[in-house]
């Protein structure tokens, strides 16, 4: 799938070197097709890494995708240059009158705080409420999934005794839903978090359908309102070295951290980490774009998006 990005976004050159089809703005204007409009609310500290990971994950269908990056106005990023944000990011006030085919809300390393203690919590809630009427399908990742469970259904998170950190085995529990079409019975996915939304509370919520879960990591994938809301408890978008970088970051800071589970061959951090989850990540995002973004966006919604976007 061609991903449309700003011409000089740093991730563009990296993706092209990986043989991923990235389309610049000039070429996209000369194609006779409507791209899917996907908004990404990027709450991760090093935003460039997440940009690359998500653009890579979105690049595996024949659909053209026009990505808009957004950051919260109420939080000052300490790990991403202001020049990068000013050039490549928008804010909610600038896009709130538009409609989008899809919205991705990323995770954030704030799970040790209560939701109300997060400085951009009110703004996040406003964006989630806005998405109810302005977005066809919203994909919530990791902390955003926990935040969504809390905001929509009142299900709070709980602290883990030890960080859930590594690559875990998951089982598909409902094959009738297109989001897991093409998944193996058992698949792997990374996790990196200190909290969890209790599996029993998710199971008890009648509005939620669980699609995949893990004995060690709990519920991984859930869906609501026929795909208008999708919740991913882990980080399938992570690249090969993300957990490695987090592990060494915490070691350098003197923080208590265990070797990532099921990640290094023989649990040896000197060895190259195994990449065991990429194909299912691609499958997940491809299914989301096809079945819940492209095929479910009503014609009237498309026209509204085109008119407002002019």
Question: In which residue ranges do the predicted regions lie?
Answer:
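Short, solvent-exposed polar/charged micro-motifs at secondary-structure junctions
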Residues: 76-82, 222, 310
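Short beta-alpha junction loops
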Residues: 71-76, 144-145
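Glycine-rich, highly charged phosphate/nucleotide-binding loops
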Residues: 80-99
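Short, Asp-centered acidic motifs that coordinate Mg2+ and/or phosphate
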Residues: 102
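Amide-donor transfer/coupling interface in amidating biosynthetic enzymes
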Residues: 1-71, 95, 99, 165-167, ...
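Cysteine-nucleophile active-site neighborhood
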Residues: 105-174
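Well-ordered alpha-helical segments embedded in enzymatic catalytic cores
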Residues: 90, 123, 284-287
